Amino acid sequence: MAERVAVFVDAGYLFAQGSAAISGSKKARVDISLNAQAVIDELKSTAQQCAAGLSLLRIYWYDGAIGGSRLTAEQALLAHLDDVKIRLGFVNSSGQQKGVDSLIVTDLIELARQKSICDAVLVSGDEDVRVGVQIAQNYGVRVHLVGITPSRGTQSLQLLQEADTTTEWKKE
């Protein structure tokens, strides 16, 4: 098994919970500005804390595409950063991100099955990714779940119970 860690980021969770942590309530995506490099640097730092000594395979950034596969300016910026791979679901007519959980599950399982990683850092709260966590663990991958304060109210209890470790990002 490769001595590498991969990071899996549900952008919908990151934006919703990040905006709530900073401003006290969830904000619409159009009202949020992301310092992409700072977030990627923090994700890399978190990966090193969770999986000390392992090299980073890459950061997988899962987000919804509006109107098909067009990248937003923010997504395009992220896609050009080193060590980042954008994976797109879609945004439905109600503005909800869809198809992202299945992409996370598929990538997590495939990287585990191929023995491409030994650790995974997951930034999500959705119970739908729990099956991917379970299967990756069956292949020997340790899964580190990262939440955004107050994560205990914003992450599935079953997902928290499945993770090997849990970490909470604070407001700062």
Per-segment meaning from a language model:
Residues 70-172:
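Nuclease catalytic cores that cleave nucleic-acid phosphodiester bonds
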Residues 1-100, 142:
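Domain-level signal for Mg2+-assisted phosphodiester chemistry and nucleotide/NA-binding surfaces
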